[in-house]
Amino acid sequence: LPDSNALAIEIKSSWVEASTLPNPQDYVTVNAIIPTYDTTNNQIWKPNGEKKAKMALIGIHIVGSVAHHPEMIWATFEHESNTPNAKYQYVDSTKAKTVKTVPQDKGTGWLFSNTTDTALTAYNNSHMTDTTATGAATDNIIATPGNTISPSNTMQTLPWGSAWGQPTNQQDSSSAASNSEIISINNNVRGMIPGEDIRKNYLFIGAIWTFKGTPPTGNGYDQNPVNPPASGTTIGTSVLANTTMETYFQSPNFSCFTCHSDSPASFAPASISHIFSKLEPLYRVHDQLNKKKK
């Protein structure tokens, strides 16, 4: 291809141990080596080794290259059983184009929620972190103040990457219009996947990019809904979040570009992607492997 960046792709995914699921056959699975922890203290878990395990895919970001969009297109997908949705609206497919409201999901049995409480305050309260009180990141899992290391209930508060009553881009007049497009894509693609293919169990939540492919500023369209949008404004489903990776970062003011951007706005690889700052020379990896063998 004439462009060396054509077809470039970046993937970030989230997994759980398949052995913890009642229906692992409904998930994409892989075998992996994962860290193990000493869990005797409910305030801090420390790594104590590794093990082989079958892992089940629960969420995935796919960042793909598109002509004239050097910021790339950021899409995210989730397993349909992850979390309940907050209420949202869509436009039905009848001639009347009626706006319909889907009430907040209720009930138990979700992978990351098991409460009958319908108050939004019952959800998305983190019980653990990897950061110390001084702000230093560690390999430990640490209980947040007043909690033990334990499960908490999660909700998708911004279904389909839009905020209730707020426009998400310059072409859709409402969140209902934007939601309808994402729901329609899911219905159409699922209709083309044959039989009991497990890919039917995953939902496209949405995708974002910037207006005219300009360097991202991190500002979402809903924060300044003008037409045309300002340079670097996030459009598409502009408050996109994945409940398995941005669990506690769901906000009508946030999207992928909130973190994957710089000031001043730039297309520099390290400004858009977090991978480049974490790259390690191969000779260093080689030396580490040799030390382990000894």
Residue map of PLM features:
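Amphipathic interfacial helices
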Residues: 45-46, 50-52, 68
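A domain-level signal for the mature, folded cores of soluble proteins
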Residues: 1-48
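A short linear-motif detector with a strong N-terminal bias
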Residues: 39, 51-52, 236
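Sequence context surrounding c-type heme c attachment/ligation sites in exported
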Residues: 8, 18, 23-28, 55-61, ...
